[in-house]
């Protein structure tokens, strides 16, 4: 779990909460604000992640005040979650999330407008694309590992071809 930002204002947001499932590598990119409180993080988590995955056994986060507050410690204790903030000035502890942050930046760089104030509208698509890529560690996409099938994207090639040359070319 990591906060990415501050970014240029986009629909009232200036930060992205990035959450990565360490088993399936499924990632969530949630627009928020740099002043979000730990209660706000907990609410985002409840509304967008808990409803799909339940309560995690362990959370690795950076040293942000939102993640190491008394509230978060109490929340983790009540829910029996092992909190594991990364070592200060040692982001490699949560290297997987740091890598995902880089991918989000690369994706947004390709799609945002020149004023960079529309990045929040691209987050859902960035999340979908990221979760549809095959991960080198699992040899499957996070989407497939979570749902057991590959998503339809509306641009799938036909599986049966009537023209023999096309059939030969696709095989």
Label every PLM stretch briefly.
Residues 26, 38, 42, 46, ...:
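Domain-scale segment recognizer with a strong primary affinity
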Residues 6-8, 48, 119:
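Residues embedded in well-ordered secondary-structure elements
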Residues 52:
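Phosphate/ATP-binding catalytic cores across multiple sugar-kinase/actin-like superfamilies
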Residues 1-3, 22, 32-34, 47, ...:
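Residues immediately flanking
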Residues 1-28:
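An active-site-proximal beta-strand-loop segment
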């Amino acid at each position: 779990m990591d906060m990415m930002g501050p970014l240029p204002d986009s629909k009232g947001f200036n930060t992205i909460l990035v959450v990565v499932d360490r088993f399936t590598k499924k990632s969530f990119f949630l627009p928020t604000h740099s002043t979000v409180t730990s209660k706000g993080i907990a609410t985002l988590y409840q509304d967008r992640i808990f409803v799909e995955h339940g309560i995690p056994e362990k959370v690795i986060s950076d040293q942000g005040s939102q993640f190491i507050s008394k509230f978060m410690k109490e929340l983790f204790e009540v829910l029996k979650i092992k909190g594991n903030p990364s070592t200060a000035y040692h982001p490699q502890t949560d290297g997987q999330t740091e890598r995902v942050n880089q991918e989000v930046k690369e994706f947004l760089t390709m799609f945002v407008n020149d004023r960079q104030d529309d990045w929040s509208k691209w987050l859902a698509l960035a999340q979908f694309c990221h979760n549809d890529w095959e991960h080198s560690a699992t040899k499957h996409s996070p989407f497939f590992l979570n749902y057991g099938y590959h998503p339809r994207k509306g641009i799938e090639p036909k599986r049966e071809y009537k023209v023999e040359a096309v059939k030969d070319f696709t095989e």
